[in-house]
A protein has these predicted regions:
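Signature for the C-terminal beta-barrel architecture of outer-membrane proteins
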Residues: 1-146
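Flexible glycine-rich, low-complexity coil/linker segments exposed to the extracellular/periplasmic environment
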Residues: 144-167
Length: 167
């Protein structure tokens, strides 16, 4: 990741020029494969790796996580059912807090699931009815030396009122 410069409002307002800084204490990488399946739907396999360490002025959970997942879906079409199914498993190590005094690495083993079923109606304004279900593991014992809470890595893309696209 890159730390954008300048990052001070006065310097931005003055149109100051500064080189961006690369943050080598956070590394994110991945592999992605997509395939048109024999019955016409789409399938995806993916792997994401995250390795982050504390740096001066920025404390982290020191996450060293691997996420593997599978997604199957059919794109919405008029007068036809569509769906999306996704499962992901996450493993590695992380810490309970970003505090510099927290030096205990916790085992990290979690999972996530998503299911969606929709139908697009034949009408001038193209209405679509959809039902969604998400599940993610949680940490049932915060003092057992394990972190069982699924980590979205960089936060939810949309959390205000679900996938309404209002904002």
């Amino acid at each position: 990741p890159v730390n954008r410069r300048p990052n001070i409002p006065a310097a931005l307002g003055d149109n100051d020029i500064k080189f961006d800084d690369e943050d080598t204490d956070v590394k994110f990488w991945g592999l992605y494969y997509s395939e048109l399946l024999s019955w016409g739907d789409l399938g995806e396999l993916y792997y994401f790796g995250l390795d982050e360490d504390d740096s001066s002025g920025r404390f982290t959970h020191n996450r060293e996580l691997s996420t593997i997942g599978l997604r199957l879906y059919r794109k919405p079409q008029t007068s036809r059912f569509d769906y999306e199914l996704e499962v992901a498993f996450q493993f590695g190590e992380s810490r309970a807090s970003p505090l510099s005094s927290d030096i205990a690495d916790l085992d990290h083993l979690t999972h996530f699931g998503h299911a969606e079923l929709g139908y697009s109606f034949l009408h001038d304004w193209h209405p679509r009815l959809i039902g969604q279900y998400d599940f993610a593991s949680g940490d049932d014992d915060p003092i057992d030396g394990e972190n069982e809470r699924f980590d979205t890595l960089f936060g939810a893309r949309r959390f205000d009122f679900g996938p309404t696209s209002i904002y």
